[in-house]
Design a protein with these regions (language model features):
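Bilobed "Venus flytrap"/periplasmic-binding protein-like clamshell domains
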Residues: 49, 54-58, 68-85, 121, ...
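Acidic, polar ligand-binding/catalytic clefts
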Residues: 77, 88-156, 297-307
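Ligand-binding clefts/hinges and TM-proximal coupling segments of bilobed small-molecule sensing domains
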Residues: 33, 170-179, 183-187, 226-228, ...
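A ligand-binding cleft/hinge motif common to bilobed small-molecule-binding domains
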Residues: 103, 117-128, 173-180, 199-202, ...
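Beta->alpha turn/N-cap motifs
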Residues: 52-56, 97-102, 111-123, 147, ...
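Extracytoplasmic small-molecule ligand-binding "clamshell" domains
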Residues: 32-36, 41-115
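Extended ligand-binding regions for polar small-molecule ligands
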Residues: 33, 74-82, 155, 160-161, ...
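Periplasmic-binding protein-like
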Residues: 54, 137-145, 220-257, 279-304, ...
Length: 312
C-alpha cells in the first residue's frame, strides 16, 4: 500500500494480512457497479484519506521525524488494508491529512477525510454528525498521586487537598463526589494540566483528578515516572474513543466494523494495545504504564460502537 503526503516509509510489520481480514460486501463481492459512498470513491480514485492528530499521544501524533505514528493511526492503517482487500485493489494510496479538535468533524462530513484516527470521544451528540467504528479505547476520570502517599481509593482522599483543571468535566465530577460522599476535600482549580500535575509534584495537592490517559502521559513524562500511581477506582463511567467515519454510509461502515472487530478480538489487538500503552514509545521512550482495564478487555472481546458508557 502506497502512502501519500507525510507518508510513513512502510507499513508496520504488524499490519494485518489482507487475507486474514476476509471481508466481503456480500456473497457477490464488491463489484464496482454495486458500490456507493466512500467505497465507490476509493475504488474510483485508488485513494483513502486518513486524518491524524499532531499531539494526541499515544493515539495519533508526530514522531521525531515529524511522521504520524500512534495506536489509533496503526488501527487506521489496518482498516485501509482491509478496504484494499475488499475492493480487490492491487494498489491503494493512503493519503494523510492533519486534523484538529475543531476541524476533525467538518473534514469527515465534507468528504476530505475518510477515517479520523485520534482520541475522539464517541458520544450521542457527535453521532448526529458522524459515525464511529468499534471502540478502541476507554478513558475514565481517575487521579494521580505520589505512590508514597498510598492514596489507593477515593475514600483515602478524605480531608485532602486535590486539584483539577478548571473548565473540565473532571473538576465537576470531583466536586460532585466530594458532596455525595462527604469527603471534606479542598478542591483547587488549575489553569491547565501541566500546572495541576506540578501541584502534586511539589506537594501543594495530594492528587490531580483528570482523564486517566492524560494522567498517564503526564506521569510518564515527569522527572520521576516511578514515583506516581494512578487510581484504579474511577470517578466516572468509561468514556469510549472511536475512529470517525461518515454518517449514513452503511457499506463502508460494515467493512470498517468487521476489520476492527477482527483485529480487537485477535491476539494481535492485545499486542497493539500493549505496544502503545505498556512499553516505551517514540520519540522520547516514555512508558504510559496503562495496562488494559477490565472494561477495555470487554470492549475488545465484544466489539461495540456504542456511545453508552453502560455498554462497557
Amino acid at each position: 500500500m502506497h502512502f501519500g503526503h507525510h507518508r510513513s516509509a512502510a507499513l508496520s510489520a504488524a499490519v494485518v494480512l489482507a487475507s486474514a481480514m476476509g471481508i466481503t460486501l456480500g456473497a457477490s463481492g464488491a463489484n464496482a457497479q454495486e458500490l456507493t459512498g466512500t467505497l465507490k470513491k476509493i475504488k474510483e480514485t485508488g485513494e483513502i484519506t486518513i486524518g491524524y492528530r499532531d499531539a494526541s499521544v499515544p493515539f495519533s501524533y508526530l514522531d521525531g521525524d515529524q511522521k504520524p505514528v500512534g495506536y489509533a493511526f496503526e488501527i487506521c492503517k489496518k482498516i485501509a488494508e482491509a478496504v484494499k482487500t475488499n475492493l480487490k485493489l492491487t494498489k491503494l494510496e493512503v493519503k494523510l491529512n492533519p486534523v484538529t479538535s475543531a476541524t476533525r468533524i467538518p473534514l469527515i462530513a465534507n468528504g476530505t477525510v475518510d477515517l479520523e484516527c485520534g482520541s475522539t470521544t464517541n458520544n450521542v451528540d457527535r453521532q448526529k454528525q458522524v459515525a464511529f467504528t468499534n471502540t478502541h479505547f476507554l478513558t475514565a476520570t481517575r487521579y494521580v498521586a505520589k505512590k508514597s502517599a498510598k492514596l489507593d481509593t477515593i475514600e483515602d482522599l478524605k480531608g485532602k487537598t486535590v486539584v483539577s483543571t478548571s473548565g473540565t468535566t473532571n473538576i465537576r465530577q470531583i466536586n460532585e463526589a466530594n458532596t455525595a460522599r462527604s469527603l471534606g476535600l479542598t478542591i483547587l482549580p488549575a489553569k491547565d494540566h501541566a500546572e495541576a500535575f506540578l501541584m502534586v509534584e511539589t506537594g501543594r495537592a495530594a492528587a490531580f483528578v483528570m482523564d486517566d490517559v492524560l494522567l498517564a502521559s503526564l506521569a510518564a513524562s515527569s522527572k520521576e515516572p516511578g514515583a506516581y500511581a494512578i487510581s484504579t477506582e474511577a470517578l466516572s463511567k468509561p468514556e469510549p474513543y472511536g475512529i470517525m467515519l461518515r454518517k449514513d454510509d452503511a457499506p463502508f461502515k460494515a467493512v470498517v466494523d468487521e476489520a476492527t472487530a477482527k483485529l480487537y478480538k485477535s491476539p494481535e489487538g492485545k499486542v497493539l494495545y500493549e505496544t502503545w500503552f505498556t512499553k516505551p514509545i517514540p520519540p522520547r521512550g516514555i512508558n504510559l504504564s496503562l495496562p488494559m482495564s477490565d472494561p477495555m478487555k470487554k470492549a475488545f472481546e465484544s466489539p461495540s460502537d456504542s456511545a453508552d458508557p453502560a455498554a462497557y
